[in-house]
Amino acid sequence: MKKACIVCLLLFLLCACAFEAQPAEVTSVSSDPAEEFSQATVTEISTEMPTEAVAVPPYIFPMEPGSYLETYQDEETQDHLDYYLFIPEGASDKMPLVIFLHGDGEVGNPALLEDFGLIKAAREIYGEKFPFIALSPCTRVESWISGSIPQTLIGLIDDISERLSINTDRIIITGHSRGAIGVWHMISTYGDFFSAAVPVSCGAETALDMENCVQVPVLAHAGNIGKNENIYREQMFNIVHKIKENGGNADLIVLENKNHTQTSTCAFAEDVFLWMLEQ
């Protein structure tokens, strides 16, 4: 027993001599915040603006200035409408669109519309620099209100408006004689699709929806020479009066010493164009 204790004591002393204390590893922590920040990894974000602005290309009008005779076919109605289209010099996007509906004498012959009615009057005033794009559709029958013609006309206007980036808040409809019948029908049916209406020398053939008519400013015109013209003037007076009674904005201008044929052009004086474009 005594020997065993001595052996254990010797082993303990040998182990104690062999063991060497290892110094502890200490991580130094700086108490200086500035020093800590200087040792951090920082990603710099530039706040400088580009020295040169990105150039925006100028708007390029999709059609050259001038006269066009084309045909539109409506996908829904499958009806056709021939039309004369005038693009003025200096045309740009968001221009107004002025539509002129012809009378019986121009049915089926859109080439006549290049020098007739509103187009003729505008060219005498503005030359080739109209302040609007002019559209003169041409029917193949003596009516603007039969069948699907009104719907096809709206389709044509939508097509032109999209292709030429028209200002859809400035779509003006005008017409002479049977074309005036079409004007009354279109504002009665489509209301504020149009921003203004100028019917010349004819009343309506069907009952008008006053709820729609009062949404459109109307400046009607009629001459005072000829039996038929006097009848048309009376018809138009009654319509204008009814629109006013229902709270709408409508007036009738009597063109002194003008017959039915003459009113097709003389109704479109410069102040009338200005009125149309202001509505």
Stretch-by-stretch model annotation:
Residues A4-A21:
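Sec-dependent N-terminal signal peptides of Gram-positive bacterial secreted proteins and lipoproteins
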Residues C17-L97, T174-H176, M186, N238-A250:
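A domain-start/cap signature at the N-terminus of enzymes
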Residues E89-D93, V141-R178:
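Gly/Ser-rich "nucleophile elbow"/oxyanion-hole loop immediately N-terminal to the catalytic nucleophile
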Residues L97, L101-I154:
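Active-site machinery of serine-nucleophile hydrolases
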Residues L113-I125, L156, S201-E211, E234-N238:
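Alpha-helical scaffolding within the catalytic cores
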Residues E162-R163, D169-V214:
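Primarily recognizes the serine-hydrolase "nucleophile elbow" in alpha/beta-hydrolase
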Residues L219-K227, R233-V240, K244-Q279:
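C-terminal catalytic histidine-bearing segment of alpha/beta-hydrolase fold enzymes
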